[in-house]
C-alpha cells in the first residue's frame, strides 16, 4: 500500500485527517494510526508504506519484527536538505511547527534508532527518482 492509500484508509476508518492533529492531539492521532497500521500488517499483502511516526507504537514495532522474518523491511532514508525540498519544511505540518528544521532533526534523532532496528536494509534516497529507489529495492529482493 502506498502512503496515500494508508492515509485514505485512515480517513475512511476514522474520519480523522492529519490536519486535525492540533485539535485532537498527537496521542489520539497515533492511537488511530496504530490501529490502522496493525490491521494492515495483519491483513494486507504487498508493499505497505508507513508514516514516520507509526513506529512509535510498541505493538507496531513488535509486529514489524515478527513480519521481518521472510519479508523485506526497507528504511528509505533522506537527508534534511532533501526532506526540506520534498515536503517543504515550512508547510503546516503539526509536528514541525516552530523551527521546522530543528524539529525534523529532533524527530529523526529520536526515531532513527528505531528505523535502523526494524529495517532489513536502508536506502539513502537523496537525489534518486522513485523508479531508481524501486530498482534498488528489487535488487535487494533478488539478493535475499
Locate predicted features:
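ATP-dependent small-molecule kinase phosphotransfer cores
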Residues: 20-65, 93, 101, 105
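Glycine-rich phosphate-binding loop of ATP-dependent small-molecule kinases
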Residues: 9, 20, 43, 69-72, ...
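Conserved phosphate-donor/acceptor-positioning beta-strand/loop module used by diverse small-molecule
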Residues: 66-90
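Short amphipathic alpha-helical segments
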Residues: 59-62, 85-89, 135-136
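NTP-dependent small-molecule kinase module
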Residues: 72, 112-144
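Single conserved hydrophobic/aromatic residue that forms the stacking wall/gate
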Residues: 1-19
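Short glycine-rich anion-binding loops that position phosphate/pyrophosphate groups of nucleotides
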Residues: 52-55, 79-81, 128
Amino acid at each position: 500500500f502506498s502512503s496515500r492509500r494508508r492515509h485514505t484508509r485512515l480517513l475512511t476508518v476514522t474520519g480523522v485527517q492529519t490536519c486535525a492533529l492540533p485539535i485532537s492531539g498527537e496521542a489520539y492521532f497515533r492511537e488511530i494510526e496504530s490501529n490502522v497500521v496493525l490491521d494492515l500488517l495483519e491483513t494486507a499483502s504487498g508493499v505497505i508504506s508507513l508514516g514516520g511516526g507509526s513506529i512509535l507504537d510498541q505493538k507496531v514495532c513488535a509486529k514489524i519484527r515478527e513480519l521481518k522474518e521472510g519479508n523485506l523491511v526497507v528504511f528509505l532514508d533522506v537527508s534534511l536538505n532533501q526532506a526540506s525540498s520534498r515536503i517543504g519544511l515550512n508547510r503546516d505540518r503539526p509536528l514541525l511547527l516552530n523551527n521546522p528544521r530543528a524539529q525534523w532533526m529532533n524527530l529523526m534523532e529520536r526515531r532513527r534508532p528505531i528505523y535502523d532496528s526494524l529495517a532489513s536494509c536502508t536506502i539513502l534516497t537523496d537525489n534518486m527518482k522513485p523508479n531508481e529507489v524501486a530498482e534498488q529495492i528489487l535488487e535487494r529482493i533478488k539478493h535475499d
